[in-house]
Amino acid sequence: MKILVRYHDGAVPLTVLPQGDWIDLCAAETVTMHAGEFRIISLGVSMQLPEGYEAHIVPRSSTFRKWGILQANSMGVIDESYCGDDDVWGFPALAMRDTTTVSYTHLRAHETGA
């Protein structure tokens, strides 16, 4: 399977985990948030998924413990139509405490096929 990836400012090259079929995505920017604040954190990539595939954006198990943020929609779904050069993937974050999420903070993505 071939997935075309475009990296934007601040993007970290994708890391395919050695076990399983997950890809670690990272925050492409340093973000300071206050408790109760919402922000979409850029992941710095656009991808063209193969026809019939979708990606799931979910937090790592340590994201809340380390950074005090929750993914606002619990799981993001990106379908194959969100594939333009400027369709930058993001992580919708809700801060539960004052925090600074540093560039290169690992988040997580998974692709599934039809």
Language-model segment annotations:
Residues 1-108, 114:
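DUTPase catalytic domain/fold
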